[in-house]
Amino acid sequence: MSKILVFGHQNPDSDAIGSSVAFAYLAKEAWGLDTEAVALGTPNEETAYVLDYFGVQAPRVVESAKAEGVETVILTDHNEFQQSISDIKDVTVYGVVDHHRVANFETANPLYMRLEPVGSASSIVYRMFKENGVSVPKELAGLLLSGLISDTLLLKSPTTHASDIPVAKELAELAGVNLEEYGLEMLKAGTNLSSKTAAELIDIDAKTFELNGEAVRVAQVNTVDINDILARQEEIEVAIQEAIVTEGYSDFVLMITDIVNSNSEILALGSNMAKVEAAFEFTLENNHAFLAGAVSRKKQVVPQLTESYNA
């Protein structure tokens, strides 16, 4: 079989990068596939910290599979086509390893799919290493651990599955790190946003969801102080409005998450703000509102928006 590109979603986070790099290695070792891990964007601050810590080179960034002369791909940490490579509909999806909802996904041929409602795609990839009797190199254990820490906010997010806890402990041992100490330093590295422009800030960790025919962009930034982000509200709103016009979003929802106190502020703009307010049972004042206890886009934001938009 010819080369297969393995990649996570656009605007890759630590789980997208870690799961794709590790799975590409596993696919070679376990099944003899000619795989290459690539990325659909440059690493964010948190992921750059992870790669540097474990001495792993960032995957090269690609925009099109066809431009690489590749006809076959494997997706990790996503399945929705609008979150994937630009020519996803023109290539063969060989397999998917994911922990999100399945939506806007269709293939012409059968494929391998591994979907589990766990805290991270990295958790699933680690299990697949064990199932296939493949040892996890120290640096890949570090990447997989980081993906799990990132997606579950160090196992504090409601997306954390009971099985994620022993996985985190095992990966920390394999990676040679203290779970709590490394996890906190890693998460803090991702909150250093002062050098980011407003346009960059709203695109660090952003995904587009098709909700009842509407293109809704849901972005998330982590911080240790929500007010640091809200102090830039004016320029952030300008960037959001530009993104709405340029990309054709109906609505843009920015989730500003306090990783210390496990709360979020929702900043939202667009044409369906009544639906956004109904989703969270709050009232937007000056385009934002507090959402107590919310840290997970996947579990505490997207399902609520989906229900509201479909009502």
Swiss-Prot record:
Keywords carried by this UniProt record: Cytoplasm, Hydrolase, Manganese, Metal-binding, Phosphoprotein
Cofactor note: Binds 2 manganese ions per subunit.
PTM per Swiss-Prot/TrEMBL: Phosphorylated on serine residue(s) by stk1. Dephosphorylated by stp1.
Residues annotated as binding Mn(2+) 2: 15, 77, 99, 151
Catalytic activity line of the entry: diphosphate + H2O = 2 phosphate + H(+)
Cellular compartments annotated: Cytoplasm
Membrane-spanning parts: none
Alphabetized GO MF terms: inorganic diphosphate phosphatase activity; manganese ion binding
Cofactor requirement: Mn(2+)
Residue sites binding Mn(2+) 1 per the record: 9, 13, 77
Primary location class: cytoplasm
Enzyme kind, highest EC tier: hydrolase
InterPro entries: DDH_dom, DHH_sf, DHHA2, DHHA2_dom_sf, Mn-dep_inorganic_PyrPase, Oligoribo/pAp-PDE_c-di-AMP_PDE
PANTHER family, A to Z: BIFUNCTIONAL OLIGORIBONUCLEASE AND PAP PHOSPHATASE NRNA
Similarity comment text for this entry: Belongs to the PPase class C family.
Protein name: Probable manganese-dependent inorganic pyrophosphatase
